[in-house]
Regions:
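Oxidoreductase cofactor-interface core, primarily capturing Rossmann-like NAD(P)-dependent enzymes
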Residues: 1-98, 107-114
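A hydrophobic C-terminal alpha-helical subdomain
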Residues: 104-165
Length: 165
């Protein structure tokens, strides 16, 4: 659109926390029966957002009218490492959840639906963490939509929906 002179606003979203519910990315029982959160993020931060907040942010962009026209708006409710996500899950679930940081290549080899695509996505987010997080600035996102949920806030409402296998 931009190449044809149409003024647009681009919205950059983040990892949907609902992937823990619907995409089989929630904690699973590992060797010894303990829960493990497996993500190929190493010690890098993962910008995340509740799916319902994406719609709310889009509404806020429309509501802003011409103020955001021609701009790129990144949205995220939180930036958390895999270890921080595992700790939040442990707190909400009331049981130990450890972080299992696979490499993107190991993740692609899991054989689960979408593992290759997710592995590529995670590799990009891991290798370009600074740029990816900066493009989804938490203060700017909250200025746009003050009701954005943090990972912990989303988790407290949705912990019972996450399948623990």
């Amino acid at each position: 659109f931009s190449q044809f002179g149409v003024q647009v606003t681009y919205m950059l979203t983040s990892f949907y926390w609902e992937n823990l519910i619907y995409m089989g990315m929630g904690p699973r029982k590992g060797a010894g029966g303990k829960l493990e959160l497996t993500l190929p993020m190493g010690d890098k931060r993962l910008p995340g957002i509740a799916a319902e907040d994406v719609g709310r942010c889009a509404y806020c962009i429309f509501k802003a009218g011409f103020d955001l026209l021609g701009k790129t708006v990144g949205v995220a409710g939180d930036h958390a490492t895999g270890a921080q996500m595992a700790a939040a899950l442990a707190k909400e679930l009331g049981q130990t959840v450890s972080y299992n940081p696979l490499s993107p290549e190991q993740f692609r080899q899991l054989g689960t639906p979408g593992a290759d695509v997710f592995g590529n996505m995670f590799q990009f987010m891991q290798e370009f963490e600074s740029e990816f997080c900066a493009a989804r600035n938490l203060d700017s996102a909250r200025a746009l939509n003050p009701s954005l949920q943090t990972f912990g806030g989303w988790l407290s409402k949705n912990k019972d929906r996450i399948p623990l296998t």
